UniProtKB/Swiss-Prot annotation:
Residues 1-23 are annotated as: Disordered. It comes from Nocardia farcinica (strain IFM 10152). Pathway: Amino-acid biosynthesis; L-arginine biosynthesis [regulation]. This is Arginine repressor. Keywords: Amino-acid biosynthesis, Arginine biosynthesis, Cytoplasm, DNA-binding, Repressor, Transcription, Transcription regulation. Regulates arginine biosynthesis genes. Its main location: cytoplasm. InterPro entries: Arg_repress (IPR001669), Arg_repress_C (IPR020899), Arg_repress_C_sf (IPR036251), Arg_repress_DNA-bd (IPR020900), WH-like_DNA-bd_sf (IPR036388), WH_DNA-bd_sf (IPR036390).
């Protein structure tokens, strides 16, 4: 049996799924693992990868998660957070189908809206604001300048001449 070296990111031949010995191959496997398991920490993810013969450092894993756009979300009940990767797997604005995905996320995560001046304020369950703000940014809505997210609150800046209240109404319509 041939064994590849762990520092090259390979997997034992005949053990588990075939893994490319590249960053892209490792990241692809990370996406699959996050989809299949409720991963609560980077060390848990590293253990899952190690079980498949993919050794990685915490710094590399952190960089991979960042490049994949992975975020840690908590359920509405405030339970332990789990890592999720955006469906499109891409941190790029204006992804095809962005508004379809945004509508689904708004339906799942939008708790309430408010407005002031040219800003719409969106409330989400704890831990979900960054994820929803990222989806808003990726959707590249023409009437949104940008977003700022905290833990459970998003400030969405309306493009003039739209007001914050009008923007909040448009976002609610998407939900």
């Amino acid at each position: 049996m041939s064994v590849s070296t762990p520092e090259r990111g390979g997997a034992e031949q005949g053990k588990g799924p075939a893994i490319a010995r590249t960053r892209a191959g490792r990241q692809s496997r990370i996406v699959e693992l996050l989809s299949a398991h409720a991963v609560r920490s980077q060390s848990e993810l590293a253990a899952l990868l190690a079980a498949e013969g993919i050794e990685t450092t915490q710094a590399t894993l952190s960089r991979d998660l960042d490049e994949l756009g992975a975020v840690k979300l908590r359920a509405a009940d405030g339970g332990a957070g789990v890592y999720v990767v955006p469906e499109d797997g891409s941190p790029v604005r204006g992804v095809t189908g962005g508004t379809d995905r945004l509508s689904k996320l708004l339906g799942d995560l939008l708790v309430s809206t408010d407005a002031s001046g040219n800003i719409a304020v969106l409330r989400t369950p704890p831990g979900a604001a960054g994820y929803l703000a990222s989806a808003l940014d990726r959707a590249a809505l023409p009437y949104v300048v940008g977003t700022i997210a905290g833990d459970d609150t998003i400030a969405v800046i309306a493009r003039e001449p739209l007001t914050g209240a009008e923007l909040a109404a448009k976002i609610e319509e998407l939900a």
